[in-house]
Regions:
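NTP-dependent nucleotidyl-transfer catalytic core
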Residues: 1-196, 201-204, 211-216, 229
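Conserved nucleotide- and phosphate/pyrophosphate-binding catalytic cores
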Residues: 207-420
Length: 420
């Protein structure tokens, strides 16, 4: 069986852990049942959850059995954040989000075979527990002093907002999840982000006190860029995995923009490429950075992992059509709309408005005289076809799927025309 810890360390996917040699021995001894939890606090998972899904997949490929926990109960409580109380959502909203997360998670794991994954929901055991049961059977094993010393709890208590008893109690519920999964599924390992370390160790302590058994946890580091800032924000916000919240095209473009200083490290973290493949791409970054081979490989791999091969091909076709000279008419309406969603746009009338009007309306030129000059010199195109007539009028044949047309000035100034 693969020494999975060495692989995770090489990829930069291992931060804190319980006793390393004991954990290594435990994993090498045979299939281990492990779990990672995902709370439905939003309609979609994001790139941070993707790191955890990738770790789960690595462990499964090494022969271990994943339990993917959707927090139908803990999602109604909310893990304490660095600042500010979470807004509690209704039971119906949390259930809807939990269903969506269930669907997203299921794409990353195999649910058949000797290391088959299992989906679980902590609402199944938490909703059956009364307040008295929780306090008598679980709460008595927790010491308030230890709970107060957890990093985020301590920061929140010291802040003006403080922390509610609801969020303060979250760590008890998470620890109980580990205990329940140990009892129900023989689960002996929890994985998660480094910000969850304190809660995860709480589960290890609880199982030791209640069952007299040693279990394990390991965390991934918080992903940062080479300059030390946190990784994972686009102009539109978080890097969502749901295509309804971030289109596959925008998702691909985000990864394509990763800096040279970060791309090799991110290839290790976010893809399943071999050491040899990544080392070859590292040479490309060092010797031919302008070709951006590593960024293209990263963007393609992560997009295919999250959205599938068909969506990747659509994204590549759209990218080629917009920036590589491909045929824009090959794009269907949905792909074209997604690829042009963030471009500037103007509404114009077929048969009345000219290409010069469009250049002015978009702010590409200050006036019609300059616009006509640009057109005459071959500096403007409609749908990747150069326009040279300075009096050219927008025509029916210029209309693409969805009533759109693309206009370009030079190489970099690209915009959308909404034609009617």
């Amino acid at each position: 069986m693969t020494d999975i810890l060495d692989e995770l360390q090489w990829r930069g996917l291992l931060a804190q852990h319980t006793d390393l040699e004991a954990l290594r021995e435990h994993l090498n001894a045979g299939p281990v049942t492990f779990y990672c939890g995902y709370d439905p606090t939003a309609p979609s998972l994001h790139h941070g959850h993707l790191v955890q899904l990738i770790v789960m997949r690595h462990l499964q490929l090494a022969g271990h059995c994943p339990l993917a926990l959707v927090g139908g109960a803990t999602g109604q409580i909310g893990d304490p954040r660095q600042s500010g109380e979470r807004q509690l959502q209704s039971t119906e909203v949390v259930k809807g989000w939990a269903d969506r997360l269930h669907s997203q998670i299921s794409k990353f794991l195999d649910f058949e075979g000797p290391a088959a994954a299992t989906m679980v929901n902590n609402l199944d055991w938490t909703q059956e527990m009364s307040a008295i049961d929780l306090l008598r059977t679980i709460g008595k094993y927790f010491r308030v002093g230890t709970m107060l010393n957890k990093d985020i709890v301590a920061r929140r208590i010291a802040s003006d907002e403080g922390i509610s008893y609801t969020e303060f109690s979250y760590q008890v519920l998470q620890a109980n999840d580990f205990l329940e999964l140990y009892r129900r599924n023989g689960c002996t390992l929890e994985t998660g982000g480094n910000d969850q370390w304190g809660n995860m160790v709480g589960g290890v302590d609880l199982i030791r006190k209640v069952e007299g058994v040693d279990t394990h946890v390991m965390t991934t580091p918080i992903i940062t860029k080479a300059d030390g800032t946190k990784f994972g924000k686009s102009e539109g916000g978080a890097i969502w995995l749901d295509p309804e919240m971030m289109t596959p095209y925008a998702f691909y473009q985000f990864w394509l923009q990763v800096a040279d200083d970060d791309v090799v490290r991110f290839l290790k973290i976010f893809t399943f490429k071999s050491r040899e493949e990544i080392e070859a791409l590292a040479v490309e970054v060092a010797e031919r950075p302008h070709q951006r081979a590593a960024q293209k490989a990263l963007a393609a791999s992560v997009t295919e992992l999250v959205h599938g091969a068909d969506q990747l091909q659509r994204v590549l076709a759209a990218t080629d059509a917009l920036w590589g000279g491909g045929d824009i008419r090959d794009l269907d309406e949905a792909t074209l709309a997604a690829a042009t969603a963030d471009l500037p746009r103007a509404s114009l009338t077929i048969g009345e408005s000219t290409v010069a009007d469009a250049l002015v309306a978009l702010g590409f030129e200050k006036g019609k005289t300059a616009a006509r000059r640009t057109i005459s010199s071959g500096g403007a195109s409609i749908n990747n076809i150069k326009v040279t007539d300075p009096e050219a009028v927008l025509r029916e044949e210029d209309v693409l799927a969805g009533g759109l047309a693309l206009i370009r000035k030079g190489r970099k100034n690209l915009a959308v025309l909404e034609l009617s």
